[in-house]
């Protein structure tokens, strides 16, 4: 069995709920639809799909089954409009952009692994002006299986040219953590509004925010050593 390296050469970020809080808007947009139809959106089922896909729970299919009829296109379109409006009102979550920039300045490789579509992830990263802070982005369009399977993280590691054992994944959900760990990576969890009440204890460390967190801070959380490029200090300054 391979012994995992204590030397960290790469950070890989989740997207939804970690870089941008899209998870609460998606949940709230469906909650509004359920409430408008006099139905309850089961939270215990909803959390099964956080960080993954609707394979485990399809909110549209479930509601239509409860109602005994299909939702109208107008209802579906208005939900998308509400979700989009709420997502566009969100700012990058605290500390993410700064940590990604500091990691690259320190000579680390930096990537994104998301179960969402490439258009969704890259579109938002570009809109937020931070797409160029990442060396590689991999989405559901690039792999056979999304989280909690390891495919996404393995794909990003291959793209970055790093060993998964030399990589820290930064996640917000149980599905994401399971994916990173299955890929052989270390994992730091940063819970959000939706995942704050979930069990994230299978991560190597849990932090409440990335605000003010530097690359050395992150690796120290799990007792590792940061690989530092020649002529640069651990905080990313030349």
PLM regions: where:
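Residue-level marker of alpha-helix boundaries and capping positions
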Residues: 21, 90, 112, 166-168
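Asp-based, Mg2+/Mn2+-dependent phosphohydrolase catalytic module
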Residues: 1-9, 101, 118-238
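Conserved phosphate-coupling serine/threonine residues in phosphotransfer and NTP-handling enzymes
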Residues: 114-116
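Short glycine/serine/threonine-biased micro-segments
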Residues: 15, 109, 174
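Residue-level detector of anion-binding/catalytic polar loops
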Residues: 40, 109, 186
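N-terminal helical cap/lid subdomain that shapes the substrate entry/recognition surface
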Residues: 4-106, 119
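A broad detector of the eukaryotic-type serine/threonine protein kinase catalytic domain
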Residues: 81-88, 108, 139-142, 161-162
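Hydrophobic beta-strand core positions in alpha/beta domains
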Residues: 111-112, 189
């Amino acid at each position: 069995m391979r012994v995992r390296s204590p030397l960290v050469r790469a950070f890989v970020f989740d997207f939804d709920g970690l870089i941008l809080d899209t998870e609460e808007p998606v949940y709230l947009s469906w909650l509004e639809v359920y409430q408008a139809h006099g139905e309850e959106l089961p939270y215990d089922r909803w959390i099964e799909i956080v960080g993954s896909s609707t394979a485990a729970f399809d909110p549209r299919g479930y509601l239509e089954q409860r109602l005994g009829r299909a939702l109208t296109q107008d209802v579906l379109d208005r939900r998308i409009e509400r979700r989009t409006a709420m997502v566009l009102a969100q700012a990058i979550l605290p500390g993410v952009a700064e940590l990604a920039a500091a990691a690259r300045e320190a000579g680390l490789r930096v990537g994104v692994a998301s179960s969402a579509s490439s258009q969704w992830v890259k579109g938002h990263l570009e809109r937020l002006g931070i797409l160029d802070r990442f060396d590689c982005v991999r989405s559901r369009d690039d792999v056979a299986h999304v989280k909690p399977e390891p495919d996404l993280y393995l794909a990003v590691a291959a793209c970055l040219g790093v060993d998964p054992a030399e990589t820290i994944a930064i996640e917000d959900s149980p599905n994401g953590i399971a994916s990173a760990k299955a890929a052989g990576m270390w994992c730091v969890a940063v819970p959000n509004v939706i995942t704050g009440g979930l069990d994230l204890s299978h991560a190597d460390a849990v932090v409440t925010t990335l605000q003010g967190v530097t690359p050395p801070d992150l690796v120290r959380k799990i007792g590792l050593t940061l690989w530092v490029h020649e002529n640069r200090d651990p905080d990313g300054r030349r």
